[in-house]
């Protein structure tokens, strides 16, 4: 059975519930300024936040500015991030990005997409994370967790990440859009997981359109039926 798109009311309830569950959502990457966030997100491609944090917890006390990391050089940076996947390419990209930040941006992380995506190793998703998390832009970075949640629940159905991103930006109410990335990624990481999703403990199971949710423990309660009737 195909998943149906959520109604506006379902979307509203969906995010009200996620907000109640996590009033102040935030990234699980450790950072203290926009540059540290940029580096951490760049390193996080095809790596876990836990593995990135282990590396940056040692790196940032030593080098957390473009000048300091550029001074380390590629080989020096590798020593700090060699436990992370694709560390060779990532080290080269980060050092090149630092050089550009120093020469073109006075060592300040740009607050716009075009200049961010011009940095080596920075694609649309990384730019979206930095714009949203560091600068409060209403952008939506779609990773594997958010792609799954969007398609599974009916919140944002799309064949690729760009389709899901555009759909999310379109349907999410303005009051939720700035925090939506964090809510969705955390929901996908801990509840709406790829295998054996925890529908039995999901706070939005009653507004989810995934046909199989009841097989994974979503309650068929009177409250659920009442909400579904309202929708």
Question: How would you describe each model-predicted region?
Answer:
Residues 3-228:
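Catalytic cores of DNA base-excision repair glycosylases
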């Amino acid at each position: 059975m195909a998943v149906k798109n959520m109604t506006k009311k379902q979307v509203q309830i969906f995010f009200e519930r996620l907000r109640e569950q996590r009033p102040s959502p935030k990234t699980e990457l450790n950072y203290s300024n926009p540059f540290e966030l940029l580096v951490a997100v760049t390193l996080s491609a095809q790596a876990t936040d836990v593995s990135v944090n282990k590396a940056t917890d040692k790196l940032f006390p030593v080098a957390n500015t473009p000048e300091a990391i550029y001074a380390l050089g590629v080989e020096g940076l590798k020593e700090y991030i060699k436990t992370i996947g694709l560390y060779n390419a990532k080290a080269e990209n980060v050092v090149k990005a630092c050089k550009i930040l120093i020469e073109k941006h006075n060592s300040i992380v740009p607050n716009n997409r075009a200049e961010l995506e011009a940095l080596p190793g920075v694609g649309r998703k990384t730019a979206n994370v930095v714009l949203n998390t560091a600068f409060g832009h209403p952008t939506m970075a779609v990773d594997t967790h958010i792609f799954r949640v969007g398609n599974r629940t009916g919140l944002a159905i799309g064949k690729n990440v760009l389709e899901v991103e555009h759909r999310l930006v379109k349907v999410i109410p303005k009051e939720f859009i700035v925090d939506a990335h964090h809510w969705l990624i955390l929901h996908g990481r801990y509840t709406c997981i790829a295998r054996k999703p925890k529908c039995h403990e999901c706070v939005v199971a009653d507004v989810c359109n995934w046909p199989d949710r009841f097989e994974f423990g979503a309650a068929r309660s009177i409250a659920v039926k009442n909400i579904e009737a309202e929708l």
